[in-house]
Amino acid sequence: MTELIEGQNKAEFIVTEANGSLSRESVTVLSGQNLQPGHILGKVSVGTATGAAVSGNTGNGTITDVSAGDTARAGIYQIVCIEPATNIGTFAVENPNGVIIGHAVVGAAFAGEVNFTLTDGATDFVAGDRFTVTAAEGSGKYKEYNPA
């Protein structure tokens, strides 16, 4: 018996659609995208992140390697020293809604909604010293989703 192999057909990835065009929406695509039929699009909701020490800190350490994580939300993250110690310290990390999302330790990379490393300075941190990480709004445009 002869075996026939059928090639890919247009829109074969569509299994079903809701009535009244509920499955379709017009979006603006980020420039430079090479979109493939059937691939998933994701909205760019968060842009870059920047970090800064808050004026009035006693400790003179810095915040470095700041970036927005995959689950970041736009807004200002608060990083507050809760356990000071000589040449180290523990900081509570709060998201823009005021929810503690983790604890950062001086000298160790923090990874989560936002990513950063706190460095020790010549003067140790005291309770209440703080940093902020501001995650900017994204473009709101869409690009091909890449989970990697």
Give the label of every model feature segment.
Residues 1-148:
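Surface-exposed, low-hydrophobicity beta-strand/loop segments enriched in small/polar/acidic residues
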